[in-house]
Every structure is written in structure tokens, then in C-alpha cells.
Swiss-Prot record:
It catalyses: a ribonucleoside 5'-phosphate + H2O = a ribonucleoside + phosphate. The keyword Plastid does not apply. The keyword tRNA-binding does not apply. GO terms for cellular component: cytoplasm. Its EC number is 3.1.3.5. SUPFAM superfamilies: SurE-like (SSF64167). It comes from Parasynechococcus marenigrum (strain WH8102). It comes from the Bacteria. One of its GO terms (molecular function) is exopolyphosphatase activity. This is 5'-nucleotidase SurE. Pfam families: SurE. It is found in: Cytoplasm.
């Protein structure tokens, strides 16, 4: 199987190298196209004002991996891979393993999820994989689980337009609880910015919010599914189905009436 892998932590990150090695160990044909440096929290941004460069980086990975380090964002990397660098269309896109969680509504700013979403938009089964702790640096168990889940999802006829978002708790495989389907949590933060003053007396800001640990809040989905945050809190891997269609799924009668002299027709 042809597997294309990217991330947002960059080509030197241990997570992506472990994931690529796990896919090779399962007998897959692996290509990596990922940022040449840290590109975390870049969301689905694209590079439009400067050229994008790509250099071979095979030596950073296990034998059998074809690798490119790209100057762009994770979404750039995936587009460049699919339309320029990779000869044959991949059977599977994997993005990760991210060095930190991608839970709940944080997926909207995640470069890891954006790379997987690019694959989804191009009709390729795609999965984002994240280690749900910034300090945890043992990726082997998560990499093996991710490849196993992806292989089984493909065998089960992976639906079109489905992106799988896998978060893995910070523990060894034998200490993990069971994998479960989960809903996206609603993520909120306290004290979003840290304000400081430079030597010339001008204010500047660091984005430095602390996440509110809410195990209950979650969006749409079956009520008997836990939130992804609650699942990770239980030391169990979470698997959340995501789709690119953001159309409002609430009641249409609840939409604003917008009485603008018949300018809005419904």
C-alpha cells in the first residue's frame, strides 16, 4: 500500500520518523513530505507570497522511506506531494504523530489535522495522529496503533469524506484502555494572552492561554460516545470522525430572519 505521511512538527520530529518506520515495518511503500521546520498551529494556511522549496531528506528516516523537507505549511506539503512530488496517488494519508494533543475544537488551528484534511479533500482516506501530551516522547505504541487502525478502516471500506482524528494517551500500549469512538470537545482557554513591554516601552503579546479541563462539553454525535478529552483523561485512545463539510446542521428555522427588504431569499 502506498502511504503518504506529513506533520506540522517538522522533518526532525521524532513522531513522524517513528510513524514512517512503523508503516515500513508493516510492508508499506512510504513517502514523507513534511515541513522543514516547526509549523505547529498553522491551521490550513497556504504559502502564496513566496516560493516553496523542497529538499530530499531520506537520510533522516529508516531505509525504504522517500522523504522531502518542504519550506511551506503542512497544507502546502500535502498539496505539493499530491500534485508534484508523488508519482502515484497514495492509498492512505497519515499526518503525525503530533507532539501534543489535537482534541476538540483545537482541530481548527491544527496543522496536523489540516494536512490530513488536504488528503480527505482529494478523496484519499486520511488520518491525523497525535500524542495527547507535550512531554511524552515515546511514540512507538501510538505509531503501531495508528497503522493498525488505518489498515482496518480501509478493510472496512473507509467512507468518502471521512477524516479520522486519533489521539493517543501518554502511556505504553499495555497500559492503555480500549479505543473508542468519540465526539469533539468544545475547547476553551483562560488568560489567552500574556502582555509584556519591550525595552523601548512598546507592548507585545504572547499567546499563552491555559486550557480549561472540561470533560463533559462536546458537540454533535451519539450521546453515548464520550468526548475526546474525557477519553484521553481515562488513559484511552480516542478516535473522532471529522468531515470537511461545515454546513450548519441545526434547525433552519433558527437561522436569523435578516429582514433586509427581500435581499435574503430562503
Amino acid at each position: 500500500m502506498r502511504v503518504l505521511i506529513s506533520n506540522d512538527d517538522g522533518v526532525f520530529a521524532e513522531g513522524i520518523r517513528t510513524l514512517a518506520a512503523a508503516a515500513v515495518a508493516r510492508g508499506h511503500d512510504v513517502t514523507v513530505v513534511c515541513p522543514d521546520q516547526e509549523r505547529s498551529a498553522t491551521g490550513h494556511g497556504l504559502t502564496l507570497q513566496t516560493p516553496i522549496r523542497a529538499e530530499r531528506a531520506d537520510e533522516l528516516f529508516v531505509p525504504g522511506v522517500t522523504a522531502w523537507a518542504c519550506s511551506g505549511t503542512p497544507a502546502d506539503c500535502m498539496k505539493l506531494a499530491l500534485f508534484e512530488l508523488v508519482k502515484d496517488k497514495p492509498d492512505l494519508v497519515l499526518s503525525g504523530i503530533n507532539h501534543g494533543p489535537n482534541l476538540g475544537t483545537d482541530v481548527f488551528c491544527s496543522g496536523t489535522v489540516a494536512a490530513a484534511m488536504e488528503g480527505t479533500l482529494e478523496g484519499i482516506p486520511s488520518m491525523a495522529i497525535s500524542s495527547a501530551c507535550f512531554q511524552w516522547r515515546q511514540f512507538q505504541a501510538g505509531a503501531e496503533l495508528a497503522v493498525e487502525v488505518a489498515e482496518q478502516a480501509l478493510a472496512d471500506q473507509w467512507p468518502e469524506n471521512l477524516l479520522l482524528n486519533l489521539n493517543i494517551p501518554p502511556c505504553n500500549r499495555d497500559a492503555m484502555g480500549p479505543l473508542r469512538w468519540t465526539r469533539l470537545s468544545i475547547r476553551r482557554y483562560d488568560e489567552q494572552f500574556s502582555s509584556r513591554v519591550d525595552p523601548r516601552g512598546r507592548a507585545y503579546y504572547w499567546l499563552a492561554g491555559e486550557v480549561v479541563n472540561d470533560l463533559e462539553s462536546a458537540g454533535e454525535g451519539p450521546r453515548d460516545w464520550p468526548s475526546d478529552v474525557a477519553q484521553i483523561h481515562a488513559n484511552s485512545p480516542s478516535l473522532t470522525p471529522i468531515q470537511p463539510d461545515l454546513f450548519w446542521r441545526g434547525s433552519l428555522s433558527g437561522l436569523p430572519q435578516l429582514k433586509l427588504k427581500d435581499q435574503l431569499v430562503r
